[in-house]
């Protein structure tokens, strides 16, 4: 049974909200709702690579499942298939040819999901939850990189049950990103390590964190020649750091900016500060999106150091985001992120994934 020819439906007979005209604040930006969204908090989103015709969206959730939708040009979404872990799914990624999806879970494993056969097999094992999973495609090797709370970074040939390589981390892996030939891993206790992936993965540099609070998300950015040149790092303290690996002028080129905070500025109106839950760079313009526990997304131009847009406030945190391969679609997930503890969790509240046309809003403004 081929995934791309069928609709095996976790959404069959579903309750589509597509085209809904409700005016409540779960969708204040009036974006397109993905049908049959997960039944628990959505921790990760990833769009298919440009090698696949069309657009397919993957989401992993705290309901232990991974779901795949086809996103049509009209914005309509068709549920295609799903797979299960035995614990919450914390990260997802695609192989470069779009035939496989890799999933990382609290069940201490990572799996490889073959979308054409709709079969999933375990390819990685850790001693604690697996927080990150990335596909690495190098000229001389291909592998899956997993980062775990067991304080290791492991590299796997999907044909073998033993890792090709294990690198020790200073602390638990909290977030990571890969754009060949660079990987960056951020850990607990504000650890930050850059790896080079040419020939074989190796540690390139440990960096003193530019942020004073817990790392939450990281995304690599490219230069004008399309080479990875630095990263954006987000923390729980409503702040993002832009960090270049080899900047001409470190003191000037590297900077941090505040985001996902309420408008209060002084003691009479104290400011509420929220976690930055996700960062994604636009694949064409190099501008970036951030999403936060405040229930807003914002678009930024890091080169001009300006904010391009901030959304209205949703009635739940935004827990994850991503762009499709050509940057026309911005996907973001609205669900509880546990930032206020279990007492604020409402199991009756629905989780949503929204799709927004992002082609124009992410363009850098013309310099005057």
From Swiss-Prot:
InterPro entries named in the record: G-protein_beta_WD-40_rep (IPR020472), WD40/YVTN_repeat-like_dom_sf (IPR015943), WD40_repeat_CS (IPR019775), WD40_repeat_dom_sf (IPR036322), WD40_rpt (IPR001680)
Location, primary (coarse class): cytoplasm
GO MF, any single term: RNA binding
GO terms of biological process kind: cell division; regulation of mitotic spindle organization; RNA export from nucleus; transcription-dependent tethering of RNA polymerase II gene DNA at nuclear periphery
Pfam families tied to this protein: WD40
UniProt keyword Lipid metabolism, yes or no: no
Classification via Gene3D superfamilies: YVTN repeat-like/Quinoprotein amine dehydrogenase
GO CC entries: cytoplasm; fibrillar center; mitotic spindle pole; nuclear pore; nucleoplasm
Keywords: Cell cycle, Cell division, Cytoplasm, Cytoskeleton, Mitosis, Nucleus, Phosphoprotein, Repeat, Transport, WD repeat
WD repeats: 37-79, 84-114, 125-157, 168-206, 215-255, 271-301, 310-346
Annotated region described as Disordered, given as residue ranges: 15-34
Modified residues (Phosphothreonine): 229
Location in or out of the cell: Cytoplasm; Nucleus; Cytoplasm, Cytoskeleton, Spindle pole
Family note: Belongs to the WD repeat rae1 family.
Record's function text: Plays a role in mitotic bipolar spindle formation. Binds mRNA. May function in nucleocytoplasmic transport and in directly or indirectly attaching cytoplasmic mRNPs to the cytoskeleton.
Complex and partners: Interacts with NUMA1 (via N-terminal end of the coiled-coil domain); this interaction promotes spindle formation in mitosis. Interacts with NUP98. Interacts with MYCBP2. Interacts with USP11.
Protein name stated in the entry: mRNA export factor
Biological classification of the source: Eukaryota, Metazoa, Chordata, Craniata, Vertebrata
């Amino acid at each position: 049974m081929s995934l791309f020819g069928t609709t095996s439906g976790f959404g069959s007979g579903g309750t589509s909200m597509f085209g809904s005209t409700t005016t409540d604040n779960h969708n204040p930006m009036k974006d397109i709702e993905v049908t049959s969204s997960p039944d628990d908090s959505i921790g990760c989103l990833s769009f298919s690579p440009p090698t696949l015709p069309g657009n397919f969206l993957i989401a992993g959730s705290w309901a232990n499942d991974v779901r795949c939708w086809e996103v049509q040009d009209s914005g309509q979404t068709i549920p295609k298939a799903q797979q299960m872990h035995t614990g919450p799914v914390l990260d997802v990624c695609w192989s470069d040819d779009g035939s496989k999806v890799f999933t990382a879970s609290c069940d201490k494993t990572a799996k490889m999901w073959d979308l054409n056969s709709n079969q999933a097999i375990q390819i990685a094992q850790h001693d604690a939850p697996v927080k990150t999973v990335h596909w690495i495609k190098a000229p001389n090797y291909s592998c899956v990189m997993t980062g775990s709370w067991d304080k290791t970074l492991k590299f796997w040939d999907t044909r073998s049950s033993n890792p090709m390589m294990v690198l020790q981390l200073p602390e638990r892996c909290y977030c990571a990103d890969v754009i060949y030939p660079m990987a960056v891993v951020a850990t607990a206790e504000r650890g930050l390590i850059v790896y080079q992936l040419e020939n074989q993965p190796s540690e390139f540099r440990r960096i003193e964190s530019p942020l004073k609070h817990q790392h939450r998300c990281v995304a690599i950015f490219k230069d004008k020649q399309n080479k990875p040149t630095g990263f954006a790092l987000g923390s729980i303290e409503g702040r993002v750091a832009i960090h270049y690996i080899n900047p001409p002028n470190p003191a000037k080129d590297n900077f941090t900016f505040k985001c996902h905070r309420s408008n209060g500025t002084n003691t009479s109106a104290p400011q509420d500060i929220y976690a930055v839950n996700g960062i994604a760079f636009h694949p064409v313009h190099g501008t970036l999106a951030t999403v936060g526990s405040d229930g807003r997304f914002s678009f930024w131009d890091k080169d001009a150091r300006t904010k391009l847009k901030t959304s209205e406030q949703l009635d739940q945190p935004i827990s994850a985001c991503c762009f499709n391969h050509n940057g026309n679609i911005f996907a973001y997930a609205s669900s509880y992120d546990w930032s206020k503890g279990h007492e604020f969790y409402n199991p009756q509240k629905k989780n949503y994934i929204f799709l927004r046309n992002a082609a124009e809003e992410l363009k850098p403004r013309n310099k005057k």
